[in-house]
């Protein structure tokens, strides 16, 4: 037995010794066999991936269709539209979008950001299969509106807070549309850009490119913010339909002949192009691309992403081509930008200032619009004086016949967005004239025709005095203070000359942001400058000017006013708790421009508006206005309170030069002014004249301290039984 075991052991040792001596050949054979097996396996796997579905398999799929239909997959369960609005535009867009989404058979909810707590509820949208839409406006200094302030604050902090993590909103799908004005350079649509960025940083998936609405019709891609939204809304609804059907992102058009036969391959190309964009573009530009590819690519990689050497070579080629295309596109864009500046300038100037939406809004407010940038409106005091119920404060201070005063403007655009704007910021804004321009002759002719037509509507109205009705058909005064900034109109001097040629006096109001235009202005009957605050900070807070150098422009405008020889006026609007505690600063500004008169008026409450935080609490009592003016007069040795109009909550400070032999001469001799301006024009501007040359005596009832308190005794005081607020202005 032991011998047999020895033989077996000897045989085994001999066999192993042979193998050891020939181990190199054994290893080589094994390596070849393994390589052949691996290659065959990979080839079989590749063929299986591209192999068409067999008829038998298709039959089995058809048999399973009823079961899949019974258990239908829901890709989009609904839409939530979040809005952050100040003037109501974003809110209106949100409601409009919701109606269109519901019309597609998809549930939709509109949510005001101020009523939504993102800390407790936003993460729920990651698993709800709901599409979140954010319609947000950019407010003062690039800040969010009051309603969106907390939402933005929380989202910004969460995007950089390690406790939330970078995947806090992973699974959430969203789209963003911003409302802004490109006139505010450096702050255009910053809120929408920030929200888009913060959501992306928390791994939320963008379903489409961020939309930007521009209130500046000159720069708006489609002519108005409403048109911008309509275009974006159409794209969103199409994208929503595709998502609801479970479709992936459509072909980008970069593939050959735009046919995506090999979807996987083209998606890889899109990812490669996207990665190149990430490397070459800034983070802000990255925000512009859709993140759909990112989410879909992750799904594909989870199924296995084995790439052989041939595919890797193709990918590298695609990356090189994509980089070349990007460089070429960048060069083309630079050439277009350089060569198209003059062309775009011309095209922008041809755009009309009044958009269809603005036209509808102003028409509802009672404006009679003229051409593409002008308007006329019947003043409240015009109607009052036609009935013999008293005139406006200009009648008390300067002798204007209110029923013969046409209130108009050749420019509905303004360079400020004042918090107390009695038009609730419905007018456009701008820092220079970039719109289509109508001739001055057309504006004046149509303004007078519209004014007369509005006067004619009072024929036969109870209480209207026949003699005043006939007088009202002939315009004697023109108040260029309706809305906007009339001095922006490039042909303002021609406009004023045409008024004077028709014996119409001119009262022009400017917001003190155009000093050069003030200097080059031809003589007017009376030139006003609005002085709404006395310090840089308070002026920025109240007027919200567009110019970055607004304070220097403001001071230069006051200096330019001081160079005028005709009648000049500072107009101060008192807003309680905003600008009533700056007496010394006001006195310094008055010394700078040395106006002939200073009007001090309590702010008029124009009703509740989302565009302003002012309430009735900000309206000073008349006694408070009197006290302010008395305190201001104590700081001004050359001025004294001359007139009062209690109904308008307004007082007039006048320079002592208009007090002759103890009596005030604040009224205007309008016939004498027309003679002087005619002589000035005939002499080519050499025969100048001053405010003292056409002053007239102020009646006793208009003087401060009189029992009438500024009410003309020839009229009858009328007290409304139903005291509704009038927002028609002065």
UniProtKB/Swiss-Prot annotation:
Domain named Flavodoxin-like: residues: 79-237
Cofactor: [4Fe-4S] cluster
Region of interest: Disordered: 253-351
CDD domains (UniProt xref): Radical_SAM
Domain of life: Eukaryota
Cofactor note: Binds 1 [4Fe-4S] cluster. The cluster is coordinated with 3 cysteines and an exchangeable S-adenosyl-L-methionine.
MF-aspect GO terms: 4 iron, 4 sulfur cluster binding; FMN binding; metal ion binding; tRNA-4-demethylwyosine synthase activity
Ranges of biased composition (kind: Basic and acidic residues): 267-282, 333-351
Cystines in this chain: none
Pathway membership, UniProt: tRNA modification; wybutosine-tRNA(Phe) biosynthesis
Single biological process term from Gene Ontology: wybutosine biosynthetic process
Signal peptide: none
Residues bound to FMN: 85-89, 176-208
Residues at which [4Fe-4S] cluster binds: 414, 418, 421
Every Radical SAM core domain range: 398-642
Pfam families: Flavodoxin_1, Radical_SAM, Wyosine_form
EC number, as in UniProt: 4.1.3.44
Purpose of the protein: Probable component of the wybutosine biosynthesis pathway. Wybutosine is a hyper modified guanosine with a tricyclic base found at the 3'-position adjacent to the anticodon of eukaryotic phenylalanine tRNA. Catalyzes the condensation of N-methylguanine with 2 carbon atoms from pyruvate to form the tricyclic 4-demethylwyosine, an intermediate in wybutosine biosynthesis.
Family listed: Belongs to the TYW1 family.
PANTHER family for this protein: S-ADENOSYL-L-METHIONINE-DEPENDENT TRNA 4-DEMETHYLWYOSINE SYNTHASE, S-ADENOSYL-L-METHIONINE-DEPENDENT TRNA 4-DEMETHYLWYOSINE SYNTHASE TYW1-RELATED
Protein name: S-adenosyl-L-methionine-dependent tRNA 4-demethylwyosine synthase TYW1
Organism, scientific name: Danio rerio (Zebrafish)
Designated gene of the protein: tyw1
